[in-house]
Regions:
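Single conserved hydrophobic/aromatic residue that forms the stacking wall/gate
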Residues: 1-9, 13
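Hydrophobic mid-bilayer segments of alpha-helices in multi-pass membrane transport proteins
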Residues: 14-26, 41-63, 86-92, 149, ...
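Interfacial loop-to-helix junctions that mark the boundaries of transmembrane helices
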Residues: 33-48, 76-81, 112-117, 201, ...
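Core transmembrane alpha-helical segments of multi-pass membrane transporters/permeases
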Residues: 44-61, 70-104, 119, 123, ...
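Membrane-interfacial loop-to-helix junctions in multi-pass transporters
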Residues: 45, 80-86, 110-127, 154-164, ...
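Hydrophobic alpha-helical transmembrane segments of multi-pass integral membrane proteins
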Residues: 86-97, 117-149, 324-363, 368-369, ...
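Alpha-helical transmembrane segments of multi-pass membrane proteins
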Residues: 89, 119-132, 158-175, 332-345, ...
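Juxtamembrane and boundary regions of transmembrane helices in multi-pass small-molecule transporters
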Residues: 170-173, 177-233, 238, 389-390, ...
Length: 446
């Protein structure tokens, strides 16, 4: 801070609510996970409480504004069209995933494993994880479903267990980055004000080369392994139809609400007519799916309120000033945006929260450096995916390790990390995409 002017130092102090949140969340997470050795310690940190403390800090600042005025500023921030849209999409996506359940994803995996030779089992796991996560919109959900299958493949075929787990995690992050119903996509697109299909096309050119490179590496390593056997389980592909409809609808550019309604309607009909669930159980599943999004919605609301106050105080100007000094031109602006969301993700271990927190700063950076909304949304989603995919204390890694341990095997995050090929290739692909940007810095105009 000593390198900044007095005015910039004052503005940095106005950014302190973000610092309060990071200290509380990261500090408690490290305490729970590594000192007290509580399993999945970061998930035990009350993130909503940490954000409430940050908002309280923001409310105590700037005595020139009365408390009622601060409430009005926060209400205007929460009532923003993009925030409301994001919340509604979160809830609709939760309802869709709740209806279809885990059986559809398992059917895709077992179908492909039964059709393709055992030597290609790990490659199949990666491709299935890509498809399932794009369809479901959740990397953690995909990992939860496919890690037991990956463990079974490892045991039956002789493939290295970290190799199988790392391939599933890589595929899960591919879909989390591209899916139309992923909370990261929803947060990035609504925060930057771009259409999901535009962000998808922007991301696709970065993610697909990384996925192809990952698949090639997996195939090369697969041919160096001695195969012992294969996995065979029953499956039902009819239950996959809702996922396919949602995927097609998103790619062709149908409104995301309409796409989700189609998915919810088709999923409900298939599950009821096929006799897979009773009507009451269907409603319970929908409720559980929506409930699973409540914390994400609360975080979005609290971050919107906190950032509205910080913006009102002029706090973001200091961060932008630091970024302007460190990064020059459009390429520099994109690097800065990627590092910003990456730092937020390292601190919070949650890529959705990282994007929501970075959104307001990134939007001002986009205007400053002449970065289009779809490019800004793509950078936020991609770099948060890269960092989230490799940190050893992220939900994805912790869920994978926990699932393997429950199955009676022992594995550590540091055994899996060298096998996370997709995030590594995604970083390379992202850097190439940024370095390839042409043109001088210019302010973006809608």
């Amino acid at each position: 801070l000593h390198l900044l002017s007095r005015r910039q130092r004052q503005m940095c102090i106005r950014d302190s609510p973000i610092g309060v949140f990071l200290v509380l969340y990261l500090g408690l997470g490290i305490l729970f996970e590594y000192v007290m050795e509580i399993p999945m310690g970061f998930d035990n940190v009350p993130i909503v409480v940490a954000f409430l403390a940050a908002i309280l800090t923001a409310c105590l600042q700037n005595p020139k504004l009365h408390f009622d005025q601060k409430l009005e500023v926060m209400a205007q921030g929460v009532g923003d069209k993009n925030i409301i849209t994001m919340l509604l999409i979160f809830l609709a996506a939760g309802s869709f995933v709740g209806i279809v359940g885990r059986s559809s994803a398992e059917s895709v995996a077992y179908c492909m494993l039964s059709l393709i030779p055992a030597r290609f089992s790990v490659a199949v796991l990666f491709v299935v994880a890509c498809f399932v996560s794009v369809a479901m919109g959740t990397s953690v959900g995909t990992i939860t479903l496919l890690v037991p299958i990956a463990a079974a493949v490892s045991k039956a075929s002789g493939f290295d267990l970290p190799f199988c787990i790392g391939s599933v995690m890589g595929g899960a992050m591919f879909g989390d980055n591209l899916s139309f119903i992923s909370d990261t996509t929803i947060a990035a697109c609504n925060g930057q004000g771009c259409k999901m299909k535009d962000k998808f096309r922007e991301n696709f050119g970065i993610a697909m080369p990384a996925a192809v490179a990952t698949l090639i590496v997996i195939l090369i390593l697969s041919f160096q392994t001695t195969i012992k056997g294969h996995v065979s389980q029953p499956y039902n592909l009819i239950q996959v139809i809702p996922y396919v409809l949602v995927l097609i609808g998103g790619v062709v550019g149908i409104n995301v609400f309409l796409v989700l309604l189609i998915g919810i309607g088709s999923g409900a009909l298939i599950m009821l007519i096929g006799g897979y669930v009773e009507p009451v159980e269907m409603l319970v599943r929908m409720g559980n799916g929506v409930s699973g999004m409540f914390e994400t919605c609360m975080v979005a609301i609290l971050v919107a309120a906190m950032c509205a106050l910080i913006r009102e105080y002029g706090g973001f100007e200091a961060l932008l000033g630091i970024i302007r000094k460190a990064f020059k031109g459009r390429r520099g602006g994109q690097f800065g945006m990627g590092l910003l969301v990456g730092a937020m993700d390292i601190a919070t271990a949650n890529n959705t929260v990282a994007i929501v927190m970075a959104n307001p700063i990134a939007k001002e950076m986009a205007a400053e450096y002449g970065i289009t909304p779809k490019k800004a949304a793509s950078i936020l989603d991609t770099f948060s995916c890269i960092f989230q995919g490799v940190i050893p204390y992220g939900a994805q890694m912790l869920v994978a390790i926990s699932a393997v341990n429950e199955l009676g095997s022992q594995i550590s995050a540091f055994q899996v990390m060298p096998r996370l090929y997709y995030p590594m290739f995604l970083l390379i692909s992202s850097l190439i995409a940024i370095v390839g940007v042409k043109g001088r810095r210019r302010r973006y105009r809608k």
